[in-house]
């Protein structure tokens, strides 16, 4: 399986496939369906300083080829994650990417400092883009200077490499990516969800209790590919690509666009075996494209 | 690793009431199903415009034939498409999922009241069958919007007494299930219920201190506990306390969670 | 049919349904399928000063529940539109919304001045958001000050009301909408397409010759609804809503979000009878919702 | 207003070569079809993940039975889904669309050469039938990738001489259609062709000054001239001059447009 291997800051991956943050809990649920050791890495649900309930329900809505979510970063909080969730990964040999979020810069710094020191945390994914948190969150992701400052602060305290997860709800994704690279990020994760809504024609009300939610799934794939294509040509740090990936063919598209590895979010809900199926199918695609290793494909749509 | 996903074949699909379909699926996965009140997370079809599965309760199981029955209302885009599928088609099913009704709560000879509303009725049928097997005495109170919506009256009659209520009075007693319970002064050792939230709220108000169990609904993403879509608050719990309907429920003791 | 009527600046519409610019040519093609007089209005293809061929082909690509286009504003130019296309509407009794585009401010002004004086042009739709024009275009739509200036200039020369068509590829749609309202726009049209791409896994190249294209169709509906919901609560001018509309139920969602009328783009390609079917179905929805007129629904998700 | 959309019923769907399907549809819309080289814009199914129709040429028409035949390669997502549809299913069709092959160009007794490549072969069959009816003498040169891809050899034989070429030499003459034309010194009064662009380019280079007509392909949106997706440049035209393949074509005189 060497053909699928990829080595990124903090993440020694057997293959380029990881479940996306928030779509795989803290791992145990899908562990009932397949052996998590098959995965290249696991991005776990966002951790905040305090335990959060998140938004009221309904928190998800279906859209054509996509879904909206407004979970609102529900999680057991920093101590809860450290005590209840992380120890379970002792039994596995798979790098963990710990997604972190907060409403103030201090929150982020505190969570990053402590979480990054835990065994089982291989890298930090800095979620500066969650569209469902009312205060703070969203602004971090749309202004290059603020994104850069947050990156710098978190890098300063983190014991492991830091990936910054970008919001697609911006006019100039390249400006933000470059600012974050300059601020010392080890990598980027893109994209988070597009802000959207549904209205129930019968009740005349927004379907989500929170009104707006993040759009994910196949619907957003073209936006994700475009942004990765733009950014990967302008930065030198690796990109974890995501947004609507369902199949190995989708993964090839993301690698060609410029991603170094990928994450699968919504598709886990449609089919819990999406990740292992992709991992099974990737070698056939390498054969078909007559390349030895997935690393030969990264950026292949523009660097050849 | 217990197998939780499979492709089952449609062996029967019939409209049992207005827009309500009885769907019988056959396949190996049925082996793993036995707990009343659990649900299946059903993929509508292979096309990719409806990405989310639909949670539907197990309404009956025939372990010999490896068949499972669901009864569902074709209301929205997904269930309508499911209803159009013909015998012989394969359906992708995740399950059985969740914590069902606690059978062991009703001892041999005890009086059980099953209270179902509309499309909440189906899981009570398999529950009733299992309770009767265990020697409990079952009375069913089933509420529907109107006569055209009534289904499964006969099967429930084979389990014990049945009271039907319709909101518009077109069949059975006029009004809600709670009206019937009052008028008929029905009592019980254990109550199990599934139906619309207002009904569950009314039952909770009455029977908070009793041995009563209710099954809840919420919009779901994963159905397996990974996405946090389906949570509810815990009564008298801390602000961030929660239960997941897909894995902690859908059945809860009355009064445990906030409706 | 009075229940469906809506009166907007320059547009006296029998019903709130018009085909969207670029998806209905200059009308004659779909005139083979149904009587165009049924429509509330018609938004015609963008007109530029000079005739344009547009981008090379392939110019369209399919995506899940959507499509990408990179037509590149092909059109016969100002004189061509005036001489060959507009006269055909003499035979019809339906207001025409003339979409205009350009690469410089002067281009816009010249086209607006002349086109707005033509009989058969009821209002101007200022396309400041076409993502496929390389120079100029995109910047107009993402910077509030520039969008406002362009609006002001065009308003100054236009003989008819001016609707400004917004780009969704921005972080703060409300800021842009407010700037445009202040600059004197009579209405807004939203949304144009999201910038996206597809890569062909087999050839390893972008599917579109232009690499990037505009994403339209059902996939973008949640983004459109969210933006209209945000903007309509902050401006007092009417909004022409669009983005993935396929059915009368979709139209109800857009009206409830805050649109005053709607446009149908991509769905015309899937089914040429989409507009007349929606017009046929809308009264049933009014009955079902127990309202007399579509105007009773505008903004109904937030103003009740 | 001429009716251009209809729901046709699948009466036959068979694999005639590797991944190539012959689809026969029946319905009233067929009445409006008569011109060889026109195409139908086919909606794959009712689900909403594939919004664009697929353009597929008319390969044959039976006006009596109101049946139209198409032959298509199940290559991508849409055509694969189409191929999975069973007899009895309805298919939503727009058409007939475009300008087909000019039948009147070949006079009674003239020599016609039909040159088809791969999935460009189908429209030539109906064209050939109509030409033979008109008294023209038809020779067909059909190129395929390999033996497994060959279809409709027998039907074409009923129209006149047939030469098959396969790129890998596994059947008929090895090489391309142009090799066959050279080796066999085939000449003609009128040539009609449909196939991959390199083939059309080679034919254009040879026969620019002759009575020759070629059918082009391009990705389409509307299929009816409204979206400007399918344009091509005009040879020696102005920079902004164009033809739309969906309405000005798909058939053009050789040399009219840039390939
Ligand atoms: C544990 C559980 C058991 C259920 N058992 C049954 C049953 O036995 N029979 C039955 O008819 N219905 C049952 N339901 C409700 C059923 O899931 C919904 O009616 C169905 O999902 C609606 O799908 P749709 O395609 O008709 O609607 P759409 O409007 O197309 O659905 C859009 C999205 O919203 C979700 N959704 C809409 N309504 C509901 C709802 N009431 N509950 C949960 N999700 C919803 C859908 O799953 C889908 O993700 C159950 C729900 C739960 C949570
Ligand atoms: C006028 C005309 C006549 C045609 N006649 C035939 C025929 O008789 N038999 C046949 O097998 N094929 C024919 N084609 C080609 C056929 O349209 C494509 O093979 C088909 O659209 C591919 O769809 P898919 O679902 O397999 O591929 P996908 O990759 O899923 O298609 C994605 C999108 O690209 C478009 N597309 C992909 N390839 C082509 C192509 N080569 N030409 C045009 N659009 C394409 C599709 O229409 C769709 O919009 C014709 C094309 C044109 C323009
Ligand atoms: C239910 C749900 C919860 C999510 N939670 C988080 C989260 O906690 N942190 C985060 O960075 N992204 C979160 N995301 C975004 C995903 O990680 C991913 O970026 C996005 O969904 C796009 O990928 P997809 O289209 O494959 O789902 C969430 C997405 C969904 C659908
Ligand atoms: C093929 C195509 C061409 C378009 N051309 C134009 C145009 O010339 N001017 C413009 O303002 N918008 C243009 N648009 C955008 C549409 O008018 C509309 O804003 C967008 O497609 C979203 O609506 P929809 O999802 O219903 O298609 C075009 C869209 C498509 C698909
Ligand atoms: S549905 Fe995902 S946690 Fe319950
Ligand atoms: S496909 Fe729309 S103009 Fe030809």
Curated annotation (Swiss-Prot), chains A, C:
GO terms for biological process: 'de novo' pyrimidine nucleobase biosynthetic process; 'de novo' UMP biosynthetic process. Heterotetramer of 2 PyrK and 2 PyrD type B subunits. It catalyses: (S)-dihydroorotate + NAD(+) = orotate + NADH + H(+). This is Dihydroorotate dehydrogenase B (NAD(+)), catalytic subunit. It is found in: Cytoplasm. The lineage of its organism: Bacteria, Bacillati, Bacillota, Bacilli, Bacillales. CDD domains: DHOD_1B_like (cd04740). Its EC number is 1.3.1.14. The keyword Transmembrane does not apply. PANTHER family: DIHYDROOROTATE DEHYDROGENASE (FUMARATE) (PTHR48109:SF1), DIHYDROOROTATE DEHYDROGENASE (QUINONE), MITOCHONDRIAL-RELATED (PTHR48109). It comes from Shouchella clausii (strain KSM-K16) (Alkalihalobacillus clausii). One of its GO terms (molecular function) is dihydroorotate dehydrogenase (NAD+) activity. The keyword Transit peptide does not apply.
UniProtKB/Swiss-Prot annotation, chains B, D:
GO terms for biological process: 'de novo' UMP biosynthetic process. Pfam families: DHODB_Fe-S_bind, FAD_binding_6, NAD_binding_1. [2Fe-2S] cluster binds at residues 222, 227, 230, 246. Pathway: Pyrimidine metabolism; UMP biosynthesis via de novo pathway; orotate from (S)-dihydroorotate (NAD(+) route): step 1/1. It comes from the Bacteria. Binds 1 [2Fe-2S] cluster per subunit. Binds 1 FAD per subunit. CDD domains: DHOD_e_trans. GO terms for molecular function: 2 iron, 2 sulfur cluster binding; electron transfer activity; flavin adenine dinucleotide binding; metal ion binding; oxidoreductase activity. Keywords: 2Fe-2S, Electron transport, FAD, Flavoprotein, Iron, Iron-sulfur, Metal-binding, Pyrimidine biosynthesis, Transport. The keyword Flavoprotein applies. Residues 3-103 form the FAD-binding FR-type domain. Its cofactor is [2Fe-2S] cluster; FAD. Belongs to the PyrK family. Heterotetramer of 2 PyrK and 2 PyrD type B subunits. This is Dihydroorotate dehydrogenase B (NAD(+)), electron transfer subunit. It comes from Shouchella clausii (strain KSM-K16). The lineage of its organism: Bacteria, Bacillati, Bacillota, Bacilli, Bacillales.
